[in-house]
């Protein structure tokens, strides 16, 4: 029986942070290790160029860092195919065919794109490549005939747009070449989109409000101790608010089943008064280090031989290209573009 196919990836615009980890990376490793799926994981460098076109060096430098993060969290090139988007030219050709099936108005209505345009402050100067990147995502997903796509909850509109393109293509060319994907979303609602340490809705390198998988223990400690809590909780003996308090939000995300009794007790104590922020932050630091310490150690080990890391990416890209080329042949045949066959 053929295994369901999973495709997922990240934009290489910097090192990955713990928001990436709980939002998608951790789940990918679980799915990989189940052994019930064929997993493709890619570094979306072409997509990253949609808003970094004049700064490609950032993306080039980030490829190695993201690959290290992948390996450190447990993605295994012997179990999963890890590849670089730009090394698969078939994806760009598929995007061109799909763009003819989507209206400009539909692209502009995509809520995820609208939000990102506002966040990036493009104004009237929206790069065409950025506006159509949902179509490129559809090419990424369909090239590998992915059945399942693990993403954050904010990416639901992207999955639906891909499904629309699949239906449009199969209907227009009277075929069943493309596969409609389903999204896989985090079970933990709090992990769906981890806020920044400062309480900002988004954790990012540019906002300097994240903990990165590559951060050493001292850096993690400094960041945790500076986290946003309850600004009105001035004195230890005063009652504090847990809603909007990033320490408790992170405890909800990173705490394991065996931690829940202690976390619940801390919440009650904090709300009654008598529990200081320093103590809650130290507890969170222990919880985070339990998760991050082994990741950090593996990352340092892989970083000793970057040549081997890039060799792994090259092999994965060659394997991925063969799959994408097969799908492209089917697409062109369905459209009648196989002139010489």
From Swiss-Prot:
Belongs to the class-I aminoacyl-tRNA synthetase family. HAMAP family: Trp_tRNA_synth_B (MF_00140_B). It is an enzyme of class 6 (ligase). One of its GO terms (cellular component) is cytosol. InterPro entries: aa-tRNA-synth_I_CS (IPR001412), aa-tRNA-synth_Ic (IPR002305), Rossmann-like_a/b/a_fold (IPR014729), Trp-tRNA-ligase (IPR002306), Trp-tRNA-ligase_bac-type (IPR024109), Trp-tRNA_synthetase (IPR050203). This is Tryptophan--tRNA ligase. L-tryptophan binds at residue 140. Catalyzes the attachment of tryptophan to tRNA(Trp). The gene is trpS. Its EC number is 6.1.1.2. It is found in: Cytoplasm. A motif ('HIGH' region) lies at residues 12-20. The keyword Ligase applies. Its main location: cytoplasm.
